[in-house]
């Protein structure tokens, strides 16, 4: 069968009396556990896992009557959400509620300076900047207050909620009496004293032991700062009645033995130390798995071959220019070092030189390339000469501006310019035509006079 068990209706039977086992077709039916039969609130089965519990409770559905809903709505304040819920559940029995949509009335524009119905830039009165800044601050605070009250939970509301404490209104909604233990406390017990406690509140109850690591000249890479083990702050532990908090008037159906507070704190402190030690061991294993490759001085290598004195041969080479001269290639090492093909490494401390050259330095025998003298860089550069400025040439622009200011203050009126008469091209052409006509008439008169004589 699957993990879902066959659920039967649990009848109110005394705890001492057991129900007879029923059989069907020779097979025994699986009933719910005795723990759930004793429970008055739970009517189902649960599948328990290592870190969590799946609740498979089946709640019977009840038909809602309009009269019962109306009676229950008289005590509790009606809301739009409640009216919509009644319409969907009751259907045609209840009269549909028409929700009036509030018209989004735009806020009137008000001037921060004079409280008029116009923008600040259109205000004609003298601007009072203190009043403007105060009005802007008030309007901004009002907008923020409306926004934060509508969305989320404010800090004032958070103060009303305390972990481990259930309000009377929530108890009434869960069907619990004043001394009943809520169902989540029983599930916390099944997970255990350590795993059942909320891990988020456990992290907050640990004292912070963060430290800064400082490096100086004497510090090394292998130096590790000693990390202190975590400590538990008992003042920040949340006490749940029925789980880790004692209360004599509780109705406990499991008869659970609640440990004292001191024992509870010591158990958690031991658990934190175990976790801390496990993490340290894991870090050490991780460090060992990635070793640093180091070679120390005077360490025997596998590629070193020891040669006896009989096998040593001196290499001789003849130069092409000097046939008689012989050059012997022989190192200046000691007799012990001659037997080794590779030189022996020596211990070198921090700050010491790697090698030494013995001999007197010769002046001018440097291998570095010569650098040009400093005088060569000054070729073509003229020296700077500080000269005094002429005092007579100063303030020309200032004098010009002062004169213009005097002219404006004295209301200087410029002289009227000569009137210029603008004549169009048509008028000029007509005047020219009239002039030519007059000249022709005069010429004709002169001719007539000559003929008359």
UniProtKB/Swiss-Prot annotation:
GO-annotated molecular function: RNA binding
One Pfam family it belongs to: PSP
Region spans: Disordered: 15-42, 425-453
Domain of life: Eukaryota
GO terms (BP aspect): RNA processing
GO cellular component: catalytic step 2 spliceosome
Biased composition (Polar residues): 425-437
Biased composition (Basic residues): 443-453
Protein name: Uncharacterized protein ZK632.11
Species for this entry: Caenorhabditis elegans
Organism taxonomic ancestry: Eukaryota, Metazoa, Ecdysozoa, Nematoda, Chromadorea
């Amino acid at each position: 069968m699957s993990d879902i068990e066959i659920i039967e209706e649990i009848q109110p039977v005394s705890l001492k009396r057991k129900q007879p086992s029923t059989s069907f077709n020779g097979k025994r039916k699986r009933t719910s556990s005795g723990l759930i039969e004793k429970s008055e609130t739970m009517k189902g089965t649960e599948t328990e896992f290592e870190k969590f519990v799946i609740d498979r409770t089946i709640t019977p559905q009840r038909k809602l009557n309009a009269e019962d809903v109306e009676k229950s709505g008289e005590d509790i304040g009606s809301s739009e959400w409640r009216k919509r819920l009644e319409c969907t559940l009751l259907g045609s029995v209840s009269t549909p509620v028409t929700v009036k949509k509030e018209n989004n009335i735009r806020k009137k524009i008000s001037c921060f300076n004079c409280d008029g119905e116009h923008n600040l830039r259109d205000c004609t009165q003298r601007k009072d900047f203190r009043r403007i800044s105060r009005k802007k601050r008030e309007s901004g605070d009002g907008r923020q207050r409306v926004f934060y009250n509508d969305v989320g939970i404010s800090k004032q509301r958070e103060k009303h909620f305390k972990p481990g404490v259930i309000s009377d209104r929530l108890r009434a909604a869960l069907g619990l009496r004043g001394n009943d233990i809520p169902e989540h406390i029983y599930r916390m017990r099944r997970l255990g004293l350590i795993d059942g406690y909320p891990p988020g509140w456990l992290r907050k109850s640990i004292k912070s032991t963060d430290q800064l690591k400082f490096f100086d000249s004497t510090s090394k890479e292998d130096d590790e700062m000693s990390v202190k083990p975590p400590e538990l702050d008992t003042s920040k532990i949340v006490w749940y009645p029925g789980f880790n908090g004692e209360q004599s008037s509780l109705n406990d159906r499991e008869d659970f033995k609640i440990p004292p507070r001191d024992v509870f704190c010591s158990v958690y402190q031991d658990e934190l130390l175990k976790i801390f030690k496990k993490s340290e061991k894991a870090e050490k294993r991780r460090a060992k798995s990635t070793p640093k490759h180091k070679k120390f001085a005077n360490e025997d290598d596998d590629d070193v071959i020891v040669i006896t004195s009989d096998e040593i041969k001196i290499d001789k080479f003849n130069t092409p220019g000097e046939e008689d001269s012989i050059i012997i290639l022989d190192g200046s090492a000691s007799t012990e070092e001659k037997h080794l093909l590779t030189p022996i490494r020596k211990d070198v401390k921090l700050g010491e030189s790697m090698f030494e050259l013995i001999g007197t330095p010769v002046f001018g025998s440097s291998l570095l390339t010569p650098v040009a003298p400093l005088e060569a860089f000054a070729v073509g550069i003229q020296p700077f000469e500080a000269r005094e400025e002429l005092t007579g040439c100063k303030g020309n622009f200032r004098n010009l501006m002062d004169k213009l200011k005097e002219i404006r203050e004295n209301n200087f009126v410029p002289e009227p310019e000569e009137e210029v008469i603008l004549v169009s091209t048509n008028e000029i052409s007509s005047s020219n035509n009239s002039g030519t006509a007059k000249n022709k008439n005069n010429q004709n008169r002169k001719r007539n006079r000559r003929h008359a004589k």
